[in-house]
């Protein structure tokens, strides 16, 4: 709590100040909004409940508004946390600021009295623990506490009515508070002061109840037992310290006031208002909303509390709004259903006998017989003969349900192959697949290598059974042996598992592929139930009888197999990792509670002693307990329906203690089952959908409701009535009050509670004849009381436990112990009637249903129903329901009938199916719409000659325009030489640098990164070098280089590198150490490119395709350009006939030559001149570029199966993903040298679907003949909106700061560097005395990045909407799209035209305002090399880039020198068009020297490359749209330096050769040339001279292009050659001949 700012004087009234401050500090529920509750505290409350349903309710209350970290235990009694949770609460609250109030004698006196009461309670508690109390003393204490409680006057009539029930609630709270008091350290002061009065003011009324005594002696999760003596001493010490603390007194006084404050002052209300208030509150109580007894210290304005949803509510209007919420309605229905299930009466002997008969008949009908088992064994023997003929070293064995006898008649036959270690698992199964396919004994032979356990599936021709053949599945075989041994030892095990499996099959929850549970998990669930019930039928496999066994280190004990069919063998191997984990857990426990040093020493000695231990544990109990099969079946359903919290605990059959999810580090979601031999993974993880889990829980409830109620052959009348009553309750929407929620409206007084509690402690005396029926009624009464506890107090009963391990034990112990006498009597009765004699006949199949029903008919008629005054005093509706059901139990036995019917058990609801691919419900993985392999591809029309020529030219144009010229290659070599000399001089003279990657492999773009590898002479590899230190030292040296900037060492990567940027060229590069394998990779790619020119053409086309679709950046979750080049090479190798050979398969001899590099064989055939001699058929493929490009798209969309095969260029034979063990990856691309490197490993399924969608759309676009407008072909074919359906590439895995994958936003290096600069700026401002905004920069929030753009490098800004660098989200063109579309920009454009027209002659070519061209969705390339900062180039260079400079004011002269960052908008990053300028061949004006005019006075028409951006057809009078050079794909507007004298080619019809210069917009795309439309840039006057006319020179592209896009200067440029300028008539004539509008226009 924050300190009050209004408490300036001690004369202020405390009450008014408290309420004022609390109303300011606390957020409460109002009439309009309900605020979310803290998830962490809700989960802590869930941990304190062993009941699955109650924990589920808590999870549904995650939207609660209260802050439970500092919740008052006395006010919010519905969710009182356990001691561990309270410790967390106290720790959180101890950091809050205490609110100070003026000291007063009254408050001091109250604090002293409170502390005295606390000391008195402590002494009484110590005495109570030292000496047991007699029943009389217990009753006396209960009476005194009841009298003390009754002295308090209720604040309202409603409170007076619910006083007795609230009494029990408060007594239970105080009992828990006394127990919690032992564990509260003295450092926690915030809540101790709140609860001390509650602990010490009154005695515990239920301290000696059996449940309380068990809780006091149980063990918590950390393994520390509650020592009573030490606990008393700790509490007394803490209380003595609190007595001297003034802050404790003040806070205690504050809490005293708040607790004594009245929630609603009824004295100020009129009688009519009080009556209306009472009626309204009675209506709210029906929906479990009650008025708070005392004012909440945290929610002072809240008057009501919903005990069902645990939400504080401000007033009645807010309560009515909360009642209408779906969450509240759902919780009410679940509460009602749970209460009704708990109120069901116990079964009668006839009922249990009928259940036994139903289970036995099911086992006989659907279970396998000895003959079926023999048939399955013969199948295994026959298959063993077939396989061992080809693989003699292998052997086959039967495992699974066929061997355990848990199989149904239609179950599969599981066969496992044992093979020697020298054999490979994938190769073995592939061979077995081929063997079985060739054999006539088996049909429908298929492979399922992508399953959790890879298998070969076939069907035996003779028997028709389905066989699943696996290999090396040793763990499953061990589990099978265990279950088989248990089935032989315990006769009820097999029929129970069969009934459970058949029930799961009927409900369709055993299908693992559709999101269900594996079938053998149900056997483990039955085994777990038989271990946990009281008394147990099966022992646990590990326990305290093993010397040195610790449940915390249970993973050190490993089960090794079954010995003599009676024991399980175990070994203890204490691993270092386990020891570290246990030490960490012990340290964590130490922080909560101090441990004794002697105990730690003993534990260490035990851990050392249990190393390398082994032994065996029995599988059967010494004295087996016999229970009827029907009773076990009903208890099994009840156990998993009501008793066991599935979402909280782990089903573990190894130990007796309940294992929590925290012990296994498994998430608290759905069902967790541990395999006893494979303990690391959850075998029920296939149930990964909450919808399926809720469906499973619903089926459990439906099954328990059906089998717990008496059923007849003609239909269950009682069940029908029961459902009718349930529907009536729901339709009336009048749920019972929370106080009376126990058994549908039972009001239980405190006297009745005392009587029943006393009767629980007394042994039950009964005769042999009427023992069963009498005990049933007593159990029913106890059940009523238990249900009252759960319903009346919400979560009180579940929160009274002191540890997770003790939460479930009292419930199981109490209920199962009460059933023990009835089990004995029932066994004798059943033995007399010869129904099921489990002690004599181990085979339950020998009894028949007819004998059971006929013999038990007489016994059921002699039952006597005994009554109990404590039960009959509860005159409630639940008792009437129970009596109705008891009347139905007295039906003749022959009328009781149970059947496993699908409609009954599923309630007619279809199963919930969840796809394992997309994780969506409603379909299976075979019908998943997101599976691109399921898309029906329409056949493509035949290709025409004209369309083929267009595709050829488009592919060639990709290479011509994007491949780096020779001059750029030369400049890259010069940069490398300069760096090498500098490093040799400054760092190490033995350093050698070499280029690799895109600079040398023949597939590099212009402005591609510089990939440099550094080696040191005298070292063949980096084994003896400290690579991290070398990289860091190299980064320090490179920072001294004047020509480099942005030096960044990255030492945490797989290959440590140093990143840098070359100032002059703007190229980015990285230096790696001994990346020699990549050099060989580069050489091989260059060799492939030199074999056939079509390889390079297709490689460049593929890279352009990937860039346009935004699927070519591995750092953002897609594939790298290197991976796409490998895809091109693989296609050309697999083409028939092939275009290129497999270089790694061409060698002399039978063995591949060895050229080992970094542990891998880097051999490939590199003698290209000898290829034609070795492979005469190499040049047989004569397909054109267009045909090959379309064939590539069709190959990867129609033929290649990404799921089954790997893209591998090292072999011609198909390589399967199963052979590489890459079945879990969506795309598998093998590195040709590093065979363990999958280039598609980082691609998610969502990104795979996006990539395949682009390929499918590309197949349709490039395969459908269409003739776009002249010069618009590239724009048509590479339209990203068409290729990606207008969608953005998935970026859910990308960092929001830098747009990369592999780290979270908090760990982003961009953010860290920005934070460092911010702190540095703050320190400078502090030194200068500027402290204005210093505090706002201490913590950086990504949402405030735009606030710091004035002093940041624009390259550090990155928009996570479009992914572009240089701006943030607020300034993104995508965000401004809607406003730009709706706003009228004609006037603003007109002003710009006027300003641009007034430019002085000789001024620089200015860059206009921001273009209104909208950024496309896929134009979000993250390559920083596409947007380098503009740099001034020396004037001795051969060319000069036409760098546009923004002008701050119209008509102002631009500044000379490099451009300033502040002069341009943050989202526009300027970029030079050409990196390496050359000297002009002719004279030029002095303006050229200042960088204000292009180098050549002559504007040369260049070929059009309008691949980027949409085309805007401007209306008459509209202004031009200027190009933004920050666009990453501006490279498409940079023509390469190519000869300009290529003769023009003509196609079908007349193709124009000229285009008006002013008819181009944006990236060179052709637009309309209407009156008033101006070009991209204002005309440049040539020294006030008239514009000359030149003869037209043939262009390098048969279509015209704006002269401003021509490459300025060329190595083969002829300066004296005249040129003609182009007019607008050509474009008009072209548009008249081609009336159809072009593709890709965004505006008309």
Swiss-Prot record:
Region (Required for interaction with LIN28A and pre-let-7 RNA): 253-333
Molecular functions per Gene Ontology: miRNA binding; RNA binding; RNA uridylyltransferase activity; zinc ion binding
Pfam families linked: MTPAP-like_central (PF22600), PAP_assoc (PF03828), TUTase (PF19088), zf-CCHC (PF00098)
Region (Disordered) location: 31-63, 96-168, 205-257, 579-617, 794-816, 1321-1348, 1401-1482
Residues recorded with modification Omega-N-methylarginine: 1624
Predominant place of localization: nucleus
Cofactor(s) named in the record: Mg(2+); Mn(2+)
Localization (cell): Nucleus; Cytoplasm; Cytoplasm, Cytoplasmic ribonucleoprotein granule
Modified residues (Phosphoserine): 104, 134, 156
Highest rank taxon of the organism: Eukaryota
Family: Belongs to the DNA polymerase type-B-like family.
Record protein name field: Terminal uridylyltransferase 4
